[in-house]
Amino acid sequence: MAKRKRQFTEAKIERMIKEGRGQGSGKDYLPWLTIQDVPSEGRVTRGVGWTTGRRHQLLSDIERDYFYLLDYCDDVSDIREQFPLLPLEETQMIAEKIGVEHPKDPKTGISIVMTTDFLITYRDKTLARTVKPSAELENERTIAKFEIERIYWDSRHVDWGIITESDLPDALIRNIEWVHKEFHNEDVPALGIFTIRNLQQMLSARLHNGEVVSRACLACDEQLGLDAGTSLALFRHFIARKIWSVDMTERIIPTLPAKDFSEKHSDIRLEAKGG
């Protein structure tokens, strides 16, 4: 299979603009960059985003982790990753004004379109966030590019900031990751509301009594004649949907009781969108 060309040319940039890259919102947004466009350890979210209803293009582990936090936040209504700083001429002008070299493609030598990792709709505000390991903040070239980015967003009165690993609570993020793909659990419509409510009541009672999560789930599977693992998947679904609450600041370990378990509400929607 031929390798996909990752270098940028003027023709490629023009084509990306015509494709609508960096345009749209919510489910219809098209990121400027995908994991096929850049040499990275990028990944596509396994399931659709809770907030947007689409799969996201995340170019590093730290981007993925920050995405989980955003997707979990009830006050976030849109997440647009790899957002382009267009028009290109504007960032070129900023670079010239502050006396730094504009980012260029190392192979073709042409100026590339800069991007902000995340453009976020938070309540009634728009936030721009760059996500980078703290070690990169010591690189002068990186700082110069950040300054171009900062000035670009400042001219639009958009709050811009940098997120590093120190801003990312690991236990919370790993918990969100663990439940994330079960947000759209296909067992919910397949089993039907009667079975789901029975399972919810039975499992809730066991968890309230401090029973180990895995043991409680297995008992419910056996009692209701469900495939092994069904109740554990639905436990994750209820947490993802925030129907149930546990202490998300400590790692959820299925071989232990659920810490600070409580039922927030019983809004079970019989829908599935894949995972």
Describe every region a protein language model picked out.
Residues 1-275:
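Electrostatic, structured charged patches in enzyme active sites and in nucleic-acid/phosphate-binding
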